[in-house]
Each structure stands twice: as structure tokens, then as C-alpha cells.
Amino acid sequence: MRRFLPLIILLSVIFLFLFGTFKKNTRVIPTPLIGQEVPVLGLEVAFYEDFEANNLVEILKSDKIKIINFWASWCLPCEVEHPILMGLSKKSDFIIIGVNYKDTEEGSAKFLNEKGNPYDLVVIDDEGMMGIEMGLTGVPETFVVNEDGKI
């Protein structure tokens, strides 16, 4: 029995390791923000269309669903995602807010002028502070905010 003890311990460790790795879904990144209000900082509004309100706080109070999309002109996946956002922008059921992440206003304006602007409002997060508050893991990243202002 004693000669099988190391084998039993080794198999137990392997089983526990495998059980722990199969249990987690690595495609889902948990966030404590679900059910919380959007953390809003004093970000500069670059441009907006068809809104009386020209600041993010007022628009987040709107009774429409909001889509907050973090993007940058230097981001290749953002370029791939852009036609999808352009298609969504043709629907009027929600507000699309673009957060230009760690980019220049010139770069973002050039990107939107060349490819089209799907956003109802664009804010500049050049230092990445809103991205930090939202738990951003990279760009592009999109959040859906309900009519009550909750993520």
C-alpha cells in the first residue's frame, strides 16, 4: 500500500488541476459593473449629432438603450468592427456612444471622416481613465446600458 501512495497523491493533484481548469470559461471575463451605473468622468465631448444634450451624463440619463463602444483609429479590430456599427447606426432604437480610447482627436476625426461616423456622440478618453473605470481589457470593447442607466 505504501508504494502506491506517491502514485495516488500524483493522480489526485492531476485530477484537481484538471477539474479546476475545465470549470472556468475563459471566454467570459467577469465584471463587477453588471447592474451598476456607468462610471462617468469629466470627458471632453468631441462631436455629437441630433442631441440637445452635449454631455455624456445627460445622454446616459436618456430613456433609450445605450451602446458604449471603446475604439481607436490605430486599432485594426476596430476597423473590422466598424461596418457592423455603421449598420447598427441606421436603427433608431438606441444611442451609440463612441469612446475614443488613447487616441488623438485628429486621428479619430480622420478615421470617422474616411469610414463614416456610426456614433451619436463621441467622447475623448485620451488618458484612458474611463477605460480604467469600466474595466477595459482592450479595444474594441462594447457595453450595453439599459434605459435605467445600468450596465
What are these regions (language model features)?
Residues P30, G35, L56-I59, M134-G135:
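Short secondary-structure boundary/capping segments
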Residues L41-I67:
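A short beta-strand-turn-helix
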